[in-house]
Amino acid sequence: MKLILIKPVKKLGKIMDIVDVANGFGRNYLLPRNYAIRATNANLEIVKSTVQQLNEKNQKGIAAAQAVMQKIDRSFITFICQTSDDGKLFGSITAKEIIKKLQISSDIKAYIDIKPIKTAGIHEVEVSLHAEVHCKIFINVARSNTEAQEYLKKFNTSLQDTNNNVLVEKNSSIS
């Protein structure tokens, strides 16, 4: 039985895929649960036009996400919070707070998959702006602005040290 998937089905296919399945699986599982429709000529025409519209919409979404990525990629966001003497936060910084501080336009949905940040310092976070567009930002958590500046200085020096090590490794492999 040939069917067109209208919802993603694990181990079978994604939306708008044309699949060939056993008659019983199609009649008893996919069709009643509205996971698929029959692959008739009329439905195939509709799917082709829908796929084209979705691809155009997807390209616009990617372009908008890349424009936002250019603005926020490798940027620093500072949070001034109360911490204990050993650098543990009283509370935590969640993905929701980070997204709110990023102030991304409402037409783009940012997604951050992290555990809540509970320690002071600089944390690297990956932000997904689209399924195909990702960028990294740095979260600077400190007790005060001066402490935040110290963390930035330490981070920049460690970054320069790693860059120097990479250059040494590249030069040694050339010799």
UniProtKB/Swiss-Prot annotation:
Keywords: Ribonucleoprotein, Ribosomal protein, RNA-binding, rRNA-binding. InterPro entries: Ribosomal_bL9 (IPR000244), Ribosomal_bL9/RNase_H1_N (IPR009027), Ribosomal_bL9_bac/chp (IPR020594), Ribosomal_bL9_C (IPR020069), Ribosomal_bL9_C_sf (IPR036791), Ribosomal_bL9_N (IPR020070), Ribosomal_bL9_N_sf (IPR036935). Pfam families: Ribosomal_L9_C (PF03948), Ribosomal_L9_N (PF01281). One of its GO terms (molecular function) is structural constituent of ribosome. It comes from the Bacteria. The keyword rRNA-binding applies. GO terms for biological process: translation. One of its GO terms (cellular component) is ribosome. PANTHER family: 50S RIBOSOMAL PROTEIN L9. Binds to the 23S rRNA. Belongs to the bacterial ribosomal protein bL9 family. This is Large ribosomal subunit protein bL9. It comes from Orientia tsutsugamushi (strain Boryong) (Rickettsia tsutsugamushi).
